[in-house]
C-alpha cells in the first residue's frame, strides 16, 4: 500500500503543473455556467494565478532526474521542464495582451481563457510525451484550441477564413504525421513507446528499410508544417494576418516552442540511429526558411504578414542549435528561444497597442509615430533591432552563441547563410524604424493625426503597456548577463535524457 501511494505521489508530481491548469479551467467553466453576471477580473485572476503557480512548480522541478511515468507514456526531465516553463511564461504574458483587445472586440472572455489554458496544457504534455498516442493527442489538443482561437472574432470574415485555412492545413499535417507514426508502429512490431520503437527497429534490423525512410519523411513533413518551415510555410502569413492579434502573439511562440520540443525528442530518440540523415534534411529546411523568410518579408506591407515571414526565418536560426546535436548547441537553441519570447511578444505588444488606437496594421501607417507616442516608438524600435540581432541588444548575443556553436560543429555553410540573412533582416526592420522616426509633420498620415495616448507615463496601468515595457527590458538588457544564463541552461540540460550516459 505504501509503495502504491509513493508511486501515486511520484507520478502525480510529474504532471502537477498541468493538473493545476486543468483545475483552473474547470473552475472558469463552472463560474461561466453558474453565474450569468460575473466579474471578469476574477476570471483573469484565476487564469494568471494558476499559470504563476504552475511555472513556480516547474522552476522547482527543472533539475530533477529523468522520470518515466504512466506506463512509459510521459517522460519528465530538465529539457521538457524548461520548454514547459517557456510555454507557461508565454501564456502569462499573452493574457494581459488580450484584455483590452477582447473588450474592444466584444468577445466572450471565459471561453477565450479556457482555450488559452487548454492549448497551454496541450503544449506542456507535448513537451514530455513519450508515446505515439500521447504525442498525437497532445498535439491535437494544442491544435484544436489554436483553430478555435484563430476564428474567435466570429464577426470578422478574415478571422473565419484564417480559422478554416488553419483547420484544413493543420488537419492535413496531422494526418501526414499520423501516417508516419503508423509505419513505425508496424515496423517495430506494434510498439507505441518511442524508446521501444527504436529498440524494435534495431532488433529487427529494419532501421535502414524503405519503410523507415517513408516514416521519417512523413514525420519530418508533419513537423515542418507545425514549425512553419519552408516549403511548408504557405499557411503562416494568412493565419497571422486574419487571426486576432493577441492570438497570433500566443501562437507565434507557444506552437513553435511545443513543436521544437517535439521535434527534438522525436529526432533524438526515434531516429537516433541515423543522426547524419535527419541533420541533412533539417539543414536544407533551415537554409530555405532563412533565405525565403527574410527575402519575402522585405516586400510585405502588413506588420503581421511581415512578422509571419520573420518568424519563418527565426525558426531557421533556431534549428542551427538542434542540428549541431551537442550540449552547447542545445543550450544556445534554448537560450535563443528564451530571448525570442521577449523580442517577439514585445513587438506584438506594440502592434496590438497601435492597432487598438488606430485600427490599422499597415506598415506605412506607422509613419511619424514618434511625434505622438515616443514610448511606443522607442519600444518597437528596440524589439525590432533585437530581432535583427543588432549589438548590444539581447538578440545579438542569442545569435552570437547560436552561430558560434554551429561554426564549431562544422556547419559552415549553414552559419554563413544565417549571417547573410541576418543582415538582410536588418534592412526591413530598419525600413520600419526609419518610417516611424523620420517623417516630418506635413507627412503624417491621418491615423497618426487622430492618435490618442491614453496613458503617456512610463509606469502605466494599461496591461498591454506593462507587458510591452517588460519585454522591451528583456529584449534590451538580458544579453548583459548572457554568461550566467548560458551556464544555467547548460547545467540544466546536462541532466536531460539526451546527454545522460
Curated annotation (Swiss-Prot):
A molecular function GO annotation: quinone binding
Family listed: Belongs to the complex I subunit 2 family.
Membrane spanning residue stretches: 15-35, 40-60, 82-102, 107-127, 132-152, 167-187, 212-232, 244-264, 278-298, 307-327, 333-353, 378-398, 410-430, 466-486
Native source species: Marchantia polymorpha (Common liverwort)
Alphabetical UniProt keywords: Chloroplast, Membrane, NAD, NADP, Plastid, Plastoquinone, Quinone, Thylakoid, Translocase, Transmembrane, Transmembrane helix, Transport
Subcellular localization(s) per the UniProt record: Plastid, Chloroplast thylakoid membrane
Recorded catalytic activity of this chain's protein: a plastoquinone + NADH + (n+1) H(+)(in) = a plastoquinol + NAD(+) + n H(+)(out); a plastoquinone + NADPH + (n+1) H(+)(in) = a plastoquinol + NADP(+) + n H(+)(out)
Role noted for this protein: NDH shuttles electrons from NAD(P)H:plastoquinone, via FMN and iron-sulfur (Fe-S) centers, to quinones in the photosynthetic chain and possibly in a chloroplast respiratory chain. The immediate electron acceptor for the enzyme in this species is believed to be plastoquinone. Couples the redox reaction to proton translocation, and thus conserves the redox energy in a proton gradient.
InterPro entries the UniProt entry points to: NADH-Q_OxRdtase_suN/2, ND/Mrp_TM, Ndh2_N
Subunit structure: NDH is composed of at least 16 different subunits, 5 of which are encoded in the nucleus.
The protein's name in its UniProt record: NAD(P)H-quinone oxidoreductase subunit 2, chloroplastic
Catalytic class of the enzyme: translocase
GO (cellular component) term, any one: chloroplast thylakoid membrane
